[in-house]
From Swiss-Prot:
HAMAP family: NorR. This is Anaerobic nitric oxide reductase transcription regulator NorR. One of its GO terms (molecular function) is ATP hydrolysis activity. SUPFAM superfamilies: GAF domain-like (SSF55781), Homeodomain-like (SSF46689), P-loop containing nucleoside triphosphate hydrolases (SSF52540). Residues 187-416 form the Sigma-54 factor interaction domain. Residues 481-500 bind DNA. Required for the expression of anaerobic nitric oxide (NO) reductase, acts as a transcriptional activator for at least the norVW operon. Activation also requires sigma-54.
Length: 506
């Protein structure tokens, strides 16, 4: 069989008729699967010694969330090194990265596999993979015909990457486009609200505006901050992180602004604060709502005038720092309650971003699950970790109050459990490996009274009451310990100690 001019023209037309890069990539993959009569096809982007799926057809949806490292996938490494069409024999001892990931064929191993590396000049930018269940499925196609397919795909991918770079170049004066500069963050998701968030990040990244990132605990606010920094002119300089909720009041000012020798007991030498460390770069202040009003006033001065004073020093230091702040609280409500300065809120929220909770991201749950499955596979040295159809449905039906962080932990626990109950280095996650309903205690009604143990003495009753109060406060505050401490009107450090004594923390 050979390709007719009409077939090649049809592929080219599909590439031009798509709306946006993602649609064009999907049209290409779907058309190739039909023309080549393969069971699965994928277009992958190459970056940082790993392949990142851009479009798939005939593969499980979670493949789009996986990141295939060369070290962990010898077939993909062979494709990256080859420079030409790669045909893997049916009896190849190199594991196929898609084994177990073709729907309705999970228990079967892929037999026929072809890899087409994609180049822009001499630079590897991606690959096309074609897989079939029959050993001789692709024998009818010559290498020359497959090279034509690769050339069409490479042209589409290189144009998309170049446009992406030119768009970034417009926002970053002085930059120049090159394929080596393309960098993909780990913000996985194709749901409409995640695509909107990514678009907003692209808009604000090239500016020097301060950004307030809001969202529930575990949604990935730190990843948003990293994406903003990496897309900014400051990307060559440091991104410095500070968790405001973990700062004791006694050292918070020193952590932010530094101190000089002798400023207080224990200050045995000069020490730079986070603002100095982030000079010409970016400072990410996580849980900004936990700062005291006194520190908020000093932070406001830095944002207004660009100078800081180390603790114990009368001199001012000039700093050039972009501030990204994150919170899981409604700072507007905090302003009304007098717990957060209105002027600081307005300084920080010039360009506010809201990170959607996982329950509002639809199929992104499956993509993220694939990403975490691949992480576990590499970490535990397994040949494959896949989700059964039942497991996918189970994950999609759950509400994820702990968001992406809870999903990550759930996948890791499920892999360990499944591995312990099945011999070998292949793990298939089933619905029963996830005890999701038991992982998060439902919030009690506000007017409920904690149940006391029967035949209790005073100590048991007191501990039972404390335990239930803490559980209720945690559930009502998205399992954020600092917010829980505020709700219970107690010190967060004391709350941690009490929770450990009551068996609520390990």
């Amino acid at each position: 069989m050979s390709f007719s001019v009409d077939v090649l023209a049809g592929i080219a037309i599909e590439l031009q008729s798509g709306i946006g890069h993602q649609d064009r990539f999907q049209r290409l993959i779907t058309t190739l699967r039909q023309v080549l009569e393969c069971d699965a096809s994928a277009l992958l982007r190459y970056e940082g010694r790993q392949f990142i799926p851009l479009a798939i057809d005939g593969l499980a949806q979670d493949v789009l969330g996986r990141r295939f490292t060369l070290e962990g996938h010898p077939r993909l490494e062979a494709i990256a090194r080859a420079g030409d069409v790669v045909r893997f024999p049916a009896d190849s001892d190199l594991p196929d990265p898609y084994d177990g990931l073709i729907p309705d064929q999970e228990s079967l191993k892929v037999h026929a596999c072809i890899g087409l590396p994609l180049f822009a000049g001499q630079t590897l930018i991606g690959a096309l993979t074609l897989d079939g269940m029959e050993p001789d499925q692709f024998d009818v196609f010559s290498d020359e015909e497959l090279r034509l397919i690769a050339a069409l795909a490479a042209g589409a991918l290189s144009n998309a990457l170049l446009i992406e770079q030119l768009e970034s170049q417009n926002m970053l004066p002085g930059s120049s486009a090159s394929f080596e500069q393309v960098k993909e963050t780990q913000m996985i998701g194709l749901s409409p609200n995640m695509m909107q968030l990514k678009k907003e990040i692209e808009i604000v990244a090239g500016s020097d505006l301060n950004v307030l990132i809001s969202g529930e605990t575990g949604t990935g606010k730190e990843l948003v901050a990293k994406a903003i920094h990496e897309g900014s002119p400051r990307a060559v300089n440091p991104l410095v992180y500070l968790n405001c909720a973990a700062l004791p009041e006694s050292v918070a000012e020193s952590e932010l602004f530094g101190h000089v020798k002798g400023a207080f007991t224990g200050a045995i030498s000069n020490r730079s604060g986070k603002f100095e460390m982030a000079d010409n770069g970016t400072l990410f202040l996580d849980e900004i709502g936990e700062l005291s009003l006194a520190l908020q006033a000093k932070l406001l001065r830095v944002l207004q005038y660009g100078d800081i004073q180390r603790v114990g020093d009368d001199r001012s230091l000039r700093v050039d720092v972009r501030v990204l702040a994150a919170t899981n609280r409604d700072l507007r409500e905090e302003v009304l309650a007098g717990r957060f300065r209105a002027d600081l809120f307005h300084r920080l929220s010039v360009f506010p971003l809201s990170v959607p909770p996982l329950r509002e991201r639809g199929e992104d749950v499956v993509l993220l699950a694939g990403y975490f499955c691949e992480q576990c596979r590499l970490r535990l040295g397994l040949s494959r970790v896949v989700l059964s159809p039942g497991a996918r449905s189970h994950l999609l039906s759950y509400g994820w109050p702990g968001n992406v962080r809870e999903l990550e932990h759930a996948i890791h626990r499920a892999v360990v459990l499944a591995r312990a109950t099945r011999a070998g280095d292949e793990v298939v996650l089933e619905a029963q490996h996830f005890a999701l309903q038991e992982e998060v205690s439902p919030a009690l009604p506000d007017d409920s009274t904690p149940t006391l143990p029967a035949n209790h003495n005073l100590r048991d009753a007191t501990e039972a009451f404390q335990r239930e109060m803490i559980r209720r406060a945690l559930a009502q505050n998205n399992h954020n310990w600092a917010a829980c401490a505020r709700a219970l009107e107690t010190d967060v450090a004391n709350l941690h100690r009490l929770a450990k004594r009551l068996g609520l923390k390990s």
